């Protein structure tokens, strides 16, 4: 337990008392360690492996973020068969750093009820917080998930 990445999840009870729900030797969910690598250049995953095998780790420290970052969890609004993901060309060129689609055309998809209904992710980068907030609020203006 000396050197690693740990996921610690807590909850505040209705009585105001904090409770530890989980402590596990893993990075947080939704690609958090990868998002930190994009934003800061610090690779927690490689360094966790290095530490696990007794190798020296690279410089791990709090670094300023380069830009404003978001991860969008892709999901369907309806049950059906996935047709395609359409992203506005200009938006794609300007902001999409990585697209990871987990389904292919005609795969069965379900309306989003939980993490197991996700169909992929987008990693986005912006020049300002205002751009980021607007893009996340107006996703239907630059992205469409087509399902039949």
Question: Where are the predicted features?
Answer:
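Active-site "cap" helix and flanking loop/linker of ATP-utilizing ligase/carboxylase catalytic domains
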Residues: 1-7, 24-79
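A generic structural signal for alpha->beta connector loops
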Residues: 2, 17, 93-95
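Short beta-strand micro-motifs enriched in acidic
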Residues: 11-15
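Solvent-exposed, flexible loop/coil residues
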Residues: 16, 36-40, 86-89
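Protein kinase-like catalytic core scaffold
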Residues: 19-22
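Peripheral (often C-terminal) accessory segments that flank ATP-dependent C-N-forming ligase machineries
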Residues: 49-148
């Amino acid at each position: 337990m000396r050197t690693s990445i740990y996921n610690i999840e807590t909850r505040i009870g209705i009585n105001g008392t904090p409770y530890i729900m989980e402590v596990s030797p893993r990075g947080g969910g939704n690609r958090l360690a990868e998002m930190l690598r994009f934003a800061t250049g610090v690779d927690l995953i490689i360094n966790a492996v290095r530490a696990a095998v007794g190798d020296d780790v690279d410089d791990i420290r709090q670094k300023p973020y380069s830009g404003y970052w978001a991860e969008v969890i892709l999901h369907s609004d309806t049950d059906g068969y996935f047709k395609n993901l359409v992203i506005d060309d200009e938006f794609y060129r300007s902001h999409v750093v990585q697209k990871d689609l987990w389904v292919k055309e005609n795969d069965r998809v379900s309306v989003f009820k939980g993490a197991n209904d996700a169909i992929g992710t987008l990693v986005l980068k912006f020049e300002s917080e205002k751009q980021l907030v607007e893009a996340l609020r107006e996703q239907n203006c630059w992205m469409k998930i087509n399902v039949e």
